[in-house]
Amino acid sequence: MDPRSEVLLRQAELFEGELLLAGLPADDLLGLLPQAHGWSWHAGDQAQLAARFAGRSRFDTQMPEGDYRAAVLFLPKSRELTDYLLQALASRLTGRPLYLVGEKRGGIERAAKQLAVYGKPRKLDSARHCQLWSVQIEQAPATPDLDALAQVYSLQLADGPLQVVSLPGVFAHGRLDRGSALLLEHLDSLPQGHLLDFGCGAGVIGAALKRRYPSSRVSLLDVDAFALASSRLTLARNGLEAELIAGTGIESAPGELAAIVSNPPFHQGVHTHYQASENLLTQAARHLRDGGELRLVANSFLKYPPLIERHLGPCRTLAEAEGFRIYSARR
């Protein structure tokens, strides 16, 4: 059981009846709160919740419809995303309580101050290195317009400017990270065919691929609903079309790919997880056609080449700059 869920269950009498759990973990909480519903933007968590509690959790960037007597937000990492989610929840809770739960090292005390916009925050509990806060919504705010919160920036690429649209909560929100910047400089000479941007974020790599290889089918895969929404906006902004896939990892990718191109993710909340990246390296061969290529950017300190060579083939370093390397291997 997630420690945040355990903190909620210490006050179980507060969470009876129709309740919305936003950003909930994939644990037993829905089973222990039989009238609660979930709102998830993590495809992996949603898949587990859907398998165990069919019809009780929704994967989306928008608050699910329903008449909830209360809502709980499990604190996300991004302050901007927290602002959006709190406003979305508060907009439907006039005269009702909104709860915020999170880990101390995740910044719950700082985030609790964001509740003050809606009323006087109260700390209800502190246990398992987590805190539970609440606020009674005195006057509901307007429903937030997610698209209006997007940040747009322009990249000057060799084949012309590319507009990137970034929503709150997406990796490197409102800017181009150094790893992706290096990868954008090394997208030439990829095999023709079906191309995948794995861990697409705001869609910068996928959009660049589609423009560079217009006759190729391009797919963008991410675990996060806000990333996929950002990618959709980025593609539309540049007049491009590509397939978007909500997936838990490389196992969700299509087969017979000509190339997998990636700035693979390794952050989840306040924790660092390399599992999705390592799965990409160990399983890429299953999704590539003969002669298909894996091309990725990674921090130089990560020992990826031995893993790539063990599971795919000889690994070449195409470039190195500012603590990052571009690796390439073919099946």
Curated annotation (Swiss-Prot):
GO annotation, cellular component aspect: cytoplasm
The entry's keywords: Cytoplasm, Methyltransferase, rRNA processing, S-adenosyl-L-methionine, Transferase
Localization terms from the record: Cytoplasm
SUPFAM superfamilies membership: S-adenosyl-L-methionine-dependent methyltransferases
Enzymatic reactions: guanosine(1207) in 16S rRNA + S-adenosyl-L-methionine = N(2)-methylguanosine(1207) in 16S rRNA + S-adenosyl-L-homocysteine + H(+)
Highest taxon above the source species: Bacteria
Keyword Methyltransferase assigned: yes
Disulfide bridge partners, by residue number: none
EC number annotated for this UniProt entry: 2.1.1.172
GO molecular function, one term: 16S rRNA (guanine(1207)-N(2))-methyltransferase activity
CDD domains the record matches: AdoMet_MTases (cd02440)
Xref: PANTHER family: RIBOSOMAL RNA SMALL SUBUNIT METHYLTRANSFERASE C
Role, per record: Specifically methylates the guanine in position 1207 of 16S rRNA in the 30S particle.
Family recorded in the similarity comment: Belongs to the methyltransferase superfamily. RsmC family.
Assembly with partners or alone: Monomer.
Protein name: Ribosomal RNA small subunit methyltransferase C
Species whose genome carries this gene: Ectopseudomonas mendocina (strain ymp) (Pseudomonas mendocina)
Gene for this chain: rsmC
